[in-house]
Amino acid sequence: MDPSRHPRTIILSDLHLGRPGGAEEAARLLPIVDGCERLILNGDTAELHHGRHRPKAEAELGKLRDLCHARAVRLDLIAGNHDPFVSEVRSLRLLDGAIYLTHGDALHPAIAPWSPHAAVMRAAFERALAQGASRAAAPTEDQLFAAAREAAIAEWQSLGDGAHVSTIANMAIRPHRALAAVVYWRSYPALVRDWAERFAPTAGTVVVGHSHRPFVRTLGGLRIVNTGAYGFPGTPLAALVESGEVLVHRVEERGGRYRLAERPIARWSAAPRGPQPPARADASADAMKPAASASAARSIDVA
Protein backbone atom coordinates (compact mmCIF):
# COMPACT_ATOMS: atom_id res chain seq x y z
CA MET A 1 0.00 0.00 0.00
CA ASP A 2 1.12 3.54 -0.77
CA PRO A 3 1.87 4.96 2.74
CA SER A 4 0.47 8.33 1.73
CA ARG A 5 -2.94 6.70 1.18
CA HIS A 6 -2.98 4.87 4.51
CA PRO A 7 -5.76 6.19 6.79
CA ARG A 8 -4.73 8.32 9.75
CA THR A 9 -4.45 5.57 12.36
CA ILE A 10 -4.13 5.87 16.14
CA ILE A 11 -3.01 2.89 18.22
CA LEU A 12 -3.76 2.68 21.96
CA SER A 13 -3.74 -0.15 24.48
CA ASP A 14 -4.78 -1.08 28.00
CA LEU A 15 -7.76 1.24 28.36
CA HIS A 16 -9.37 -1.14 30.89
CA LEU A 17 -12.78 0.41 30.26
CA GLY A 18 -15.16 -0.14 33.13
CA ARG A 19 -12.56 -0.45 35.85
CA PRO A 20 -11.77 2.36 38.31
CA GLY A 21 -8.28 3.62 37.61
CA GLY A 22 -8.52 2.84 33.90
CA ALA A 23 -9.95 5.00 31.14
CA GLU A 24 -13.33 3.98 32.66
CA GLU A 25 -15.70 5.62 30.14
CA ALA A 26 -15.77 5.63 26.34
CA ALA A 27 -16.83 9.29 26.21
CA ARG A 28 -13.45 10.31 27.59
CA LEU A 29 -11.86 9.11 24.32
CA LEU A 30 -13.97 11.34 22.08
CA PRO A 31 -11.14 13.76 21.12
CA ILE A 32 -8.99 10.80 20.07
CA VAL A 33 -11.79 9.23 18.04
CA ASP A 34 -12.41 12.59 16.36
CA GLY A 35 -8.71 12.80 15.47
CA CYS A 36 -8.38 9.64 13.37
CA GLU A 37 -9.84 7.61 10.55
CA ARG A 38 -8.89 4.27 12.08
CA LEU A 39 -8.56 3.39 15.77
CA ILE A 40 -6.70 0.24 16.78
CA LEU A 41 -7.02 -0.87 20.40
CA ASN A 42 -4.18 -3.24 21.14
CA GLY A 43 -5.57 -5.43 23.91
CA ASP A 44 -7.13 -5.02 27.36
CA THR A 45 -9.60 -2.52 25.95
CA ALA A 46 -12.33 -3.44 28.43
CA GLU A 47 -12.20 -5.02 31.88
CA LEU A 48 -14.15 -8.10 30.80
CA HIS A 49 -11.89 -10.32 32.90
CA HIS A 50 -13.30 -9.37 36.31
CA GLY A 51 -16.87 -10.26 37.17
CA ARG A 52 -17.50 -7.18 39.28
CA HIS A 53 -16.41 -4.82 36.47
CA ARG A 54 -17.77 -6.77 33.48
CA PRO A 55 -21.25 -5.16 33.20
CA LYS A 56 -19.85 -1.63 33.01
CA ALA A 57 -16.98 -2.77 30.77
CA GLU A 58 -19.41 -4.30 28.28
CA ALA A 59 -21.57 -1.17 28.32
CA GLU A 60 -18.62 1.17 27.76
CA LEU A 61 -17.25 -1.03 24.98
CA GLY A 62 -20.63 -0.79 23.26
CA LYS A 63 -20.57 3.00 23.62
CA LEU A 64 -17.09 3.12 22.11
CA ARG A 65 -18.24 1.09 19.12
CA ASP A 66 -21.14 3.52 18.69
CA LEU A 67 -18.84 6.56 18.89
CA CYS A 68 -16.63 5.16 16.15
CA HIS A 69 -19.55 4.09 13.98
CA ALA A 70 -21.21 7.51 14.21
CA ARG A 71 -18.00 9.16 13.01
CA ALA A 72 -17.16 6.59 10.32
CA VAL A 73 -13.98 5.66 12.20
CA ARG A 74 -12.84 2.10 11.63
CA LEU A 75 -12.37 0.32 14.97
CA ASP A 76 -10.06 -2.68 15.26
CA LEU A 77 -9.88 -4.64 18.51
CA ILE A 78 -6.93 -6.89 19.30
CA ALA A 79 -7.57 -9.33 22.13
CA GLY A 80 -5.55 -9.14 25.34
CA ASN A 81 -5.46 -11.17 28.53
CA HIS A 82 -8.19 -9.08 30.19
CA ASP A 83 -10.50 -9.36 27.16
CA PRO A 84 -9.47 -12.62 25.44
CA PHE A 85 -12.82 -13.03 23.69
CA VAL A 86 -13.34 -9.44 22.54
CA SER A 87 -11.91 -10.41 19.15
CA GLU A 88 -10.33 -13.33 17.31
CA VAL A 89 -7.54 -10.97 16.24
CA ARG A 90 -4.30 -11.32 18.21
CA SER A 91 -1.95 -9.43 15.90
CA LEU A 92 -2.11 -6.97 13.02
CA ARG A 93 0.28 -5.93 10.28
CA LEU A 94 0.14 -2.49 8.69
CA LEU A 95 1.79 -1.10 5.54
CA ASP A 96 2.58 -4.50 4.06
CA GLY A 97 4.14 -5.74 7.28
CA ALA A 98 6.33 -2.72 8.04
CA ILE A 99 4.40 -2.28 11.32
CA TYR A 100 3.42 -5.18 13.56
CA LEU A 101 1.04 -5.01 16.52
CA THR A 102 0.26 -7.47 19.28
CA HIS A 103 -0.84 -6.97 22.87
CA GLY A 104 2.19 -8.66 24.41
CA ASP A 105 0.68 -11.14 26.85
CA ALA A 106 1.84 -14.16 24.83
CA LEU A 107 5.51 -13.19 25.11
CA HIS A 108 5.96 -14.77 28.56
CA PRO A 109 4.52 -18.11 29.77
CA ALA A 110 3.38 -16.58 33.07
CA ILE A 111 1.56 -13.81 31.12
CA ALA A 112 1.88 -11.36 34.04
CA PRO A 113 4.74 -12.55 36.29
CA TRP A 114 3.82 -10.00 38.98
CA SER A 115 0.28 -11.37 39.35
CA PRO A 116 -0.74 -13.49 42.36
CA HIS A 117 -2.06 -15.90 39.70
CA ALA A 118 1.20 -16.09 37.72
CA ALA A 119 1.79 -19.75 38.60
CA VAL A 120 -1.76 -20.67 37.55
CA MET A 121 -1.32 -18.88 34.24
CA ARG A 122 2.08 -20.43 33.54
CA ALA A 123 0.75 -23.93 34.19
CA ALA A 124 -2.22 -23.37 31.86
CA PHE A 125 0.01 -21.83 29.18
CA GLU A 126 2.49 -24.70 29.24
CA ARG A 127 -0.27 -27.31 29.33
CA ALA A 128 -2.00 -25.79 26.30
CA LEU A 129 1.28 -25.51 24.44
CA ALA A 130 2.17 -29.13 25.15
CA GLN A 131 -1.18 -30.25 23.78
CA GLY A 132 -1.05 -28.14 20.64
CA ALA A 133 2.60 -27.91 19.65
CA SER A 134 4.53 -30.44 17.63
CA ARG A 135 7.50 -31.95 19.41
CA ALA A 136 9.53 -31.62 16.22
CA ALA A 137 9.04 -27.88 15.77
CA ALA A 138 8.97 -24.66 17.74
CA PRO A 139 5.45 -23.43 18.55
CA THR A 140 3.80 -21.23 15.97
CA GLU A 141 2.48 -17.75 16.59
CA ASP A 142 -1.10 -19.04 16.62
CA GLN A 143 -0.21 -21.80 19.11
CA LEU A 144 1.37 -19.26 21.46
CA PHE A 145 -1.67 -17.00 21.17
CA ALA A 146 -3.97 -19.94 21.91
CA ALA A 147 -1.88 -20.86 24.95
CA ALA A 148 -2.03 -17.26 26.20
CA ARG A 149 -5.82 -17.32 25.88
CA GLU A 150 -5.99 -20.53 27.94
CA ALA A 151 -3.79 -18.88 30.56
CA ALA A 152 -6.12 -15.88 30.68
CA ILE A 153 -9.12 -18.18 31.13
CA ALA A 154 -7.32 -19.97 33.97
CA GLU A 155 -6.72 -16.66 35.73
CA TRP A 156 -10.34 -15.70 35.11
CA GLN A 157 -11.47 -18.88 36.85
CA SER A 158 -9.11 -18.20 39.77
CA LEU A 159 -10.43 -14.67 40.17
CA GLY A 160 -14.05 -15.70 40.54
CA ASP A 161 -15.99 -12.47 41.08
CA GLY A 162 -12.90 -10.41 40.32
CA ALA A 163 -9.90 -8.82 41.94
CA HIS A 164 -10.65 -7.03 45.17
CA VAL A 165 -7.15 -5.63 45.70
CA SER A 166 -5.54 -3.16 43.30
CA THR A 167 -2.23 -3.81 41.59
CA ILE A 168 -0.54 -1.14 43.72
CA ALA A 169 -1.94 -2.62 46.94
CA ASN A 170 -0.90 -6.11 45.86
CA MET A 171 2.67 -4.93 45.37
CA ALA A 172 2.66 -3.14 48.73
CA ILE A 173 1.42 -6.27 50.50
CA ARG A 174 3.77 -8.57 48.58
CA PRO A 175 7.01 -6.72 47.70
CA HIS A 176 8.27 -9.67 45.66
CA ARG A 177 5.46 -8.88 43.19
CA ALA A 178 6.94 -5.43 42.65
CA LEU A 179 10.36 -7.00 42.06
CA ALA A 180 8.84 -9.40 39.53
CA ALA A 181 7.28 -6.45 37.70
CA VAL A 182 10.59 -4.58 37.55
CA VAL A 183 12.41 -7.65 36.24
CA TYR A 184 9.71 -8.11 33.61
CA TRP A 185 9.83 -4.44 32.58
CA ARG A 186 13.58 -4.69 32.04
CA SER A 187 13.33 -7.86 29.97
CA TYR A 188 10.25 -6.83 27.98
CA PRO A 189 11.96 -4.99 25.09
CA ALA A 190 14.17 -8.02 24.42
CA LEU A 191 11.13 -10.32 24.55
CA VAL A 192 9.44 -8.12 21.95
CA ARG A 193 12.53 -8.14 19.73
CA ASP A 194 12.85 -11.92 19.91
CA TRP A 195 9.16 -12.37 19.09
CA ALA A 196 9.42 -10.03 16.11
CA GLU A 197 12.47 -11.83 14.77
CA ARG A 198 10.44 -15.06 14.73
CA PHE A 199 7.04 -13.87 13.61
CA ALA A 200 7.44 -10.42 12.02
CA PRO A 201 10.93 -10.31 10.51
CA THR A 202 10.05 -7.59 7.98
CA ALA A 203 8.60 -5.20 10.56
CA GLY A 204 10.62 -2.09 11.24
CA THR A 205 8.23 -1.05 14.02
CA VAL A 206 6.49 -3.16 16.67
CA VAL A 207 3.75 -1.71 18.87
CA VAL A 208 2.82 -3.52 22.09
CA GLY A 209 1.11 -2.85 25.41
CA HIS A 210 0.40 -5.21 28.33
CA SER A 211 3.23 -4.35 30.73
CA HIS A 212 1.72 -0.90 31.49
CA ARG A 213 5.16 0.73 31.29
CA PRO A 214 5.30 3.12 28.31
CA PHE A 215 8.53 3.42 26.35
CA VAL A 216 10.11 3.93 22.94
CA ARG A 217 13.18 1.81 22.22
CA THR A 218 15.41 0.83 19.33
CA LEU A 219 16.97 -2.64 19.48
CA GLY A 220 19.08 -3.81 16.57
CA GLY A 221 17.31 -1.49 14.14
CA LEU A 222 13.84 -2.46 15.40
CA ARG A 223 11.65 0.35 16.76
CA ILE A 224 9.57 -0.79 19.72
CA VAL A 225 6.71 1.26 21.18
CA ASN A 226 4.91 0.28 24.35
CA THR A 227 1.81 2.45 24.55
CA GLY A 228 1.45 1.94 28.30
CA ALA A 229 -1.84 1.96 30.17
CA TYR A 230 -4.53 4.25 31.53
CA GLY A 231 -3.66 4.41 35.20
CA PHE A 232 -0.73 2.92 37.12
CA PRO A 233 2.21 3.34 36.59
CA GLY A 234 2.65 6.15 34.05
CA THR A 235 1.50 8.37 31.22
CA PRO A 236 0.03 6.40 28.30
CA LEU A 237 1.29 6.88 24.77
CA ALA A 238 -0.39 6.76 21.37
CA ALA A 239 1.25 5.59 18.16
CA LEU A 240 0.02 7.61 15.20
CA VAL A 241 0.56 6.23 11.69
CA GLU A 242 0.21 8.93 9.06
CA SER A 243 1.79 9.82 5.70
CA GLY A 244 4.30 7.00 5.90
CA GLU A 245 5.53 7.91 9.38
CA VAL A 246 5.11 6.63 12.93
CA LEU A 247 4.69 9.44 15.46
CA VAL A 248 4.56 8.72 19.18
CA HIS A 249 2.54 11.14 21.31
CA ARG A 250 1.83 11.35 24.98
CA VAL A 251 -1.86 11.01 25.82
CA GLU A 252 -2.98 13.88 28.01
CA GLU A 253 -6.10 14.19 30.13
CA ARG A 254 -7.75 17.60 30.07
CA GLY A 255 -11.26 18.39 31.21
CA GLY A 256 -11.98 14.72 31.81
CA ARG A 257 -11.14 13.82 28.19
CA TYR A 258 -8.11 12.15 26.64
CA ARG A 259 -6.31 13.67 23.69
CA LEU A 260 -2.94 13.43 21.98
CA ALA A 261 -0.31 15.95 23.05
CA GLU A 262 0.32 18.55 20.36
CA ARG A 263 3.89 17.47 19.61
CA PRO A 264 5.26 13.94 19.26
CA ILE A 265 8.05 12.73 21.51
CA ALA A 266 9.51 10.62 18.70
CA ARG A 267 8.93 9.95 15.00
CA TRP A 268 10.41 7.87 12.20
CA SER A 269 9.67 6.47 8.77
CA ALA A 270 7.25 3.54 8.76
CA ALA A 271 9.66 1.41 6.75
CA PRO A 272 10.36 -2.33 6.77
CA ARG A 273 13.16 -3.50 9.00
CA GLY A 274 16.64 -2.63 7.83
CA PRO A 275 19.45 -0.16 8.52
CA GLN A 276 17.81 3.01 9.85
CA PRO A 277 18.97 6.14 11.68
CA PRO A 278 18.10 6.48 15.38
CA ALA A 279 14.58 7.59 16.24
CA ARG A 280 14.63 11.33 16.80
CA ALA A 281 12.85 13.32 19.45
CA ASP A 282 10.82 16.17 17.97
CA ALA A 283 13.06 19.23 18.14
CA SER A 284 10.23 21.47 19.32
CA ALA A 285 8.98 19.22 22.11
CA ASP A 286 10.26 21.10 25.16
CA ALA A 287 9.32 18.33 27.57
CA MET A 288 11.53 15.87 25.74
CA LYS A 289 14.62 18.02 25.07
CA PRO A 290 16.90 15.54 26.91
CA ALA A 291 15.98 12.98 24.24
CA ALA A 292 17.56 15.06 21.48
CA SER A 293 20.88 13.25 21.75
CA ALA A 294 21.33 10.14 19.64
CA SER A 295 21.70 7.85 22.64
CA ALA A 296 18.65 9.19 24.48
CA ALA A 297 16.50 9.10 21.38
CA ARG A 298 17.12 5.39 21.14
CA SER A 299 15.55 4.82 24.56
CA ILE A 300 12.71 6.97 25.88
CA ASP A 301 10.95 5.89 29.07
CA VAL A 302 7.82 7.81 29.97
CA ALA A 303 7.08 8.25 33.66
List PLM regions with ranges.
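Core catalytic region of metal-dependent phosphoesterases/phosphodiesterases
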Residues: 2-8, 12, 17-98
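Short, solvent-exposed coil/turn elements at secondary-structure transition points
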Residues: 15, 81, 107, 230, ...
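N-terminal short leaders/motifs
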Residues: 28-56, 157-167, 174-203
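Flexible, glycine-rich phosphate/dinucleotide-binding loops
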Residues: 48, 84, 108, 233, ...
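A general structural signal for short secondary-structure boundary/capping elements
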Residues: 56, 84-87, 126, 143-153, ...
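Conserved beta-sheet core of the metallophosphoesterase superfamily
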Residues: 62, 66, 91-123, 185-249
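Active-site-proximal loop/helix segment associated with metal-binding centers of metalloenzymes
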Residues: 104-191
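Binuclear metal-dependent phosphoesterase catalytic core
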Residues: 214, 218-294, 298-303
